[in-house]
């Protein structure tokens, strides 16, 4: 990593309903670009698909290159809390698409919020009765 190379942070929020990608500078203070699966596909049911995530990632890569970024550190987040702890189908597709677009990939970290014995899951004592 040379001194004159410009790096940023790509925050990927991937749920089973959508994938949202936000690129910030290395401090995280200034947002460079933001795209989601819902912005690039027409049907709501396709928002969370890997195709939508790849399309959003290529637009993110173009915006980042335009601003002079050479590489991105990746921060992947799932809904977490009382929801799913694993990211949706768009997370892996996003990272692959960024790498294919010519962006260098730095650190990849998982920032999913995990409760440390907070509130209980919805459903009550006996669970959801169907």
From Swiss-Prot:
Q: Which residues form the signal peptide?
A: none
- Give a single Pfam family match: Ribosomal_S11
One GO MF term: rRNA binding
Indicate the segments annotated as coiled coil, or none if absent.
none
**Presence of the UniProt keyword Ribosomal protein in the record:** yes
Q: Where is this region: Disordered?
A: 109-130
Q: Which GO terms describe its cellular component?
A: ribonucleoprotein complex; ribosome
Enumerate the InterPro entries for this protein.
Ribosomal_uS11 (IPR001971), Ribosomal_uS11_archaeal (IPR019961), Ribosomal_uS11_CS (IPR018102), Ribosomal_uS11_sf (IPR036967)
Q: Name one GO biological process term.
A: translation
Keywords, comma-separated and alphabetical: Ribonucleoprotein, Ribosomal protein, RNA-binding, rRNA-binding
Cross-referenced PANTHER family: 40S RIBOSOMAL PROTEIN S14/30S RIBOSOMAL PROTEIN S11
Q: Which family does it belong to?
A: Belongs to the universal ribosomal protein uS11 family.
Q: What is this protein called?
A: Small ribosomal subunit protein uS11
- Gene symbol here is rps11
């Amino acid at each position: 990593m040379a001194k004159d190379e410009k790096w940023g942070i790509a925050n990927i929020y991937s749920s089973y309903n959508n994938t949202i990608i936000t690129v910030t500078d290395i401090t995280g203070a200034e947002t460079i670009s933001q795209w989601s699966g819902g912005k690039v596909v027409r049907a709501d049911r396709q928002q969370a698909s890997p195709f939508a995530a790849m399309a959003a990632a290529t637009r993110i890569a173009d915006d980042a290159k335009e601003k002079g970024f050479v590489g991105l550190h990746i921060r992947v987040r799932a809904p977490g809390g009382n929801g799913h702890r694993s990211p949706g189908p768009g997370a892996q597709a996003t990272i692959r698409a960024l790498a294919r677009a010519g962006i260098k990939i730095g650190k990849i970290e998982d920032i999913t919020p995990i409760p440390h014995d907070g509130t209980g899951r919805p459903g009550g004592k006996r669970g959801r009765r169907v």
